[in-house]
Amino acid sequence: MKVIFLKDVKGKGKKGEIKNVADGYANNFLFKQGLAIEATPANIKALEAQKRKEQRQAEEELAKAKQLKEKLEQITVELSAKAGEGGRLFGSITSKQIAEVLQSQHQIKIDKRKIELDDAIRSLGYTNVPVKLHPEVTATLKVHVTEQK
């Protein structure tokens, strides 16, 4: 019997795949557990429509990420912190602080987990910080840390 997998089934098939399986296995396990549906022409059409929709959404997300990348690379985030001699900061600048300043100064909301700061910023001056907007799109954000008076 041909079935369309709704979820990944180890050793049998991945979500969205159409495969031939034993009738008993399909009726007694896959259908009852909600892991698959019968591959009727109507169900196959619905699956193809859903795949097209997901493809369109993925393309839109990629376009939005590229647009945001352009915007972010034009911006310099200005932060001030208390510093000691030689430009060393008391404390550090974290990705959370950078995200908050982006929100307050530029009205751009970015999750702090997308800001890939290997180590917190501990010195004055300019720092280039990578921001992963999409698996294929990474922007570079300029962060300028000045001394707080």
Curated annotation (Swiss-Prot):
Protein origin, superkingdom: Bacteria
Keyword Ribosomal protein in record: yes
Keywords: Ribonucleoprotein, Ribosomal protein, RNA-binding, rRNA-binding
InterPro entries: Ribosomal_bL9 (IPR000244), Ribosomal_bL9/RNase_H1_N (IPR009027), Ribosomal_bL9_bac/chp (IPR020594), Ribosomal_bL9_C (IPR020069), Ribosomal_bL9_C_sf (IPR036791), Ribosomal_bL9_N (IPR020070), Ribosomal_bL9_N_sf (IPR036935)
GO process terms (BP): translation
GO molecular function, one term: rRNA binding
Pfam families cross-referenced by the UniProt entry: Ribosomal_L9_C, Ribosomal_L9_N
Keyword rRNA-binding: yes
Any one cellular-component term (Gene Ontology): ribosome
Gene3D superfamilies per UniProt: Ribosomal protein L9, C-terminal domain, Ribosomal protein L9, N-terminal domain
Function text: Binds to the 23S rRNA.
HAMAP family noted in UniProt: Ribosomal_bL9 (MF_00503)
Similarity comment: Belongs to the bacterial ribosomal protein bL9 family.
Protein name: Large ribosomal subunit protein bL9
